């Protein structure tokens, strides 16, 4: 009788241990499926292109940090569409996950000028691949030989710091000019009788922000007529 009771206790203990499981449990607790996610954390587009993404488990409003560069449209409860607007980089912050967005130019007519505002000549010289025509104390003039529309890039320095850039376009290349402006710049709310005014898509508080003005009538430069575009940083005059 005592043996029967003893074996009964052993069987009870074995059953209890099996039901409780242990380190070798074949069915561990699964992590929560409520974590916020986005189907693509690095989006690369050209201006005007779109990309669809799926966002799960995020109840707040979804927006792009800089809506001048890209925007996001809600299609349904999970699907969204990112639209490239202007050349630049921005992001979508979903708190626990981030989506980086890079918008590239749609039209590639020439190499961008160097925009190292406030820097000296050496930064520009190390960047430029164009033909250096003149090197003066307050300016560097480069000739563009690999573009159908741009002829010269003229860097201007104030107190040895890059403050503005003049770009000289061929006057018969208005389509290319407009494509370039559309890729890169926002139209300004201000007006000027002599210039069409634009600005970079960055916030005006950003030290890299700059203004853009396009002369409405051709200007004479090096004995030829051109359309003048001036980029200028308000922090360096």
Question: What spans do the regions from the language model cover?
Answer:
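C-terminal motif of bacterial Sec signal peptides marking the signal peptidase cleavage site
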Residues: 16-19
């Amino acid at each position: 009788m005592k043996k029967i009771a003893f074996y009964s206790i052993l069987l009870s203990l074995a059953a209890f241990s099996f039901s409780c499981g242990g380190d070798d449990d074949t069915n561990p607790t699964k992590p929560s499926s409520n974590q916020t996610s986005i189907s693509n954390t690095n989006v690369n587009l050209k201006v005007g292109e779109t990309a669809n993404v799926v966002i799960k488990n995020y109840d707040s409003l979804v927006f792009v940090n800089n809506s001048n560069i890209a925007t996001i449209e809600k299609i349904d409860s999970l699907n969204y569409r990112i639209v490239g607007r202007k050349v630049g980089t921005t992001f979508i912050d979903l708190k626990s996950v981030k989506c980086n967005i890079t918008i590239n130019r749609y039209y590639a007519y020439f190499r961008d000028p160097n925009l190292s505002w406030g820097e000296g000549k050496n930064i520009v010289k190390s960047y430029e691949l164009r033909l250096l025509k003149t090197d003066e104390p307050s300016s560097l003039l480069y000739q563009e030989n690999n573009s159908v529309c741009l002829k010269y890039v003229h860097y201007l320095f104030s107190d040895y710091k890059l403050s503005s850039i003049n770009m000289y376009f061929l006057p018969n290349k208005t389509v290319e000019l407009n494509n370039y402006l559309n890729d890169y710049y926002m139209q300004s709310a201000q007006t000027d009788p002599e210039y069409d005014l634009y600005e970079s898509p960055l916030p005006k508080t950003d030290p890299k922000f700059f203004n853009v003005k396009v002369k409405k009538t051709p200007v004479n430069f090096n004995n030829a007529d051109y359309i003048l575009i001036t980029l200028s940083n308000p922090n360096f005059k």
